Amino acid sequence: MSLMQFSGLLVVWLLSTLFIATLTWFEFRRVRFNFNVFFSLLFLLTFFFGFPLTSVLVFRFDVGVAPPEILLQALLSAACFYGVYYVTYKTRLRKRVVDVPRKPLFTMNRVETHLTWVILMGIALVSVAIFFMHNGFLLFRLHSYSQIFSSEVSGVALKRFFYFFIPAMLVVYFLRQDSKAWLFFLVSTVAFGLLTYMIVGGTRANIIIAFAIFLFIGIIRGWISLWMLAAAGVLGIVGMFWLALKRYGLNVSGDEAFYTFLYLTRDTFSPWENLALLLQNYHNIDFQGLAPIVRDFYVFIPTWLWPGRPSIVLNSANYFTWEVLNNHSGLAISPTLIGSLVVMGGALFIPLGAIVVGLIIKWFDWLYELGNREPNRYKAAILHSFCFGAIFNMIVLAREGLDSFVSRVVFFLVVFGASLLVAKLLFWLFDSAGLIHKRTTSLPQAQVEGKL
């Protein structure tokens, strides 16, 4: 890449970043937080944060990348995607009706709410315990990270249930919403994330999600300023780099350490070059249609229910890894949201996917506002826990693609909804058995004496 080509890419990157950052800033000033703000920041991180890192790798370490014209296509496709997404998100198809009483879909009381978070926490802890009994601490047993996807590890499906510890702790926080509950959320979820990091053998997702939710709650409540958020972001990047070194068993120093930091940080937070690789091999892609979305559900079907279930699922990530990169190491490489749309239907699917994503984020914001307006604090805690708990799925959406997001959000909805139903059933059983007693508010002693 020549300096002239780099200068052209830099101009496009600056304009695109300024375009998205400006819209995000205006939205932040208007509402402080909603899921449009979160997705916009996540989109910036995924598709634009990596460009400076790539530039340093190219000019400092002479690392090979896709041709400049392909990198230009990747930047422009990301900017155009966001433009279509933003218009879709801001477009209102019907007039907004305010203060119209509607029959609630469900209600929650104190006992049902506490039962819900206990059930969610129980699902996570029991899954971790069973996985640990089968495999022990994989971080200290396995020699490479790719081994966690091999036949040496049993009970891999249980990992999908670990995450429900975070929604459980979110319910606990939203019932109190003070600084002590906020700090308790951070300590409990990060401690759980470190435990799963050691047990699973290097999975950092629970730690990243817990820290991100903690920061956004702090922004909403005014406990964290923007400069504190930036400082926490830098700390998070350094922390994820250190965990990555431990995960891959790397011992580096000097220039090698700087090089490793650049490419691991890029791959962790901003795999935008994967989109460029897909565009570079565009003519070799056999478009998969909507099949990757259907196939991604296969992993949730147990083999005893479907004995002939394919052992290998050809979703967009695996198609990109195996067919495009010809990589059969056992790891699935993230194609990104736009990359998954390219795998499914080429360039035509990019604006269509942007419209779908705009509607998805609009729905989450509607649910979030519903929780903000809810007078029943127990129901509000459940709604907010569901919305913030789905942040992990939004990260999956940006990094892994639309197919992975759909299957995971449906799974999250089913487990979360089932926990609610079980909590309501248990409350009904306890109430029928006479075990539930209403709380009585005792009058102050002075008032009691006055009435006497």
Swiss-Prot record:
GO cellular component entries: plasma membrane
GO biological process, one term: enterobacterial common antigen biosynthetic process
Chief location: membrane
Keyword field: Cell inner membrane, Cell membrane, Membrane, Transmembrane, Transmembrane helix
Localisation per UniProt entry: Cell inner membrane
Membrane topology, from the record: Multi-pass membrane protein
Pathway as given in its UniProt record: Bacterial outer membrane biogenesis; enterobacterial common antigen biosynthesis
InterPro entries, A to Z: WzyE
Annotated TM spans: 6-26, 37-57, 63-83, 118-138, 155-175, 181-201, 207-227, 228-248, 341-361, 378-398, 410-430
Stated role: Probably involved in the polymerization of enterobacterial common antigen (ECA) trisaccharide repeat units.
Family: Belongs to the WzyE family.
Complexes and interactors: Probably part of a complex composed of WzxE, WzyE and WzzE.
Record NCBIfam families: PRK02975.1
Descriptive protein name: Probable ECA polymerase
Organism: Salmonella paratyphi B (strain ATCC BAA-1250 / SPB7)
Lineage of origin: Bacteria, Pseudomonadati, Pseudomonadota, Gammaproteobacteria, Enterobacterales
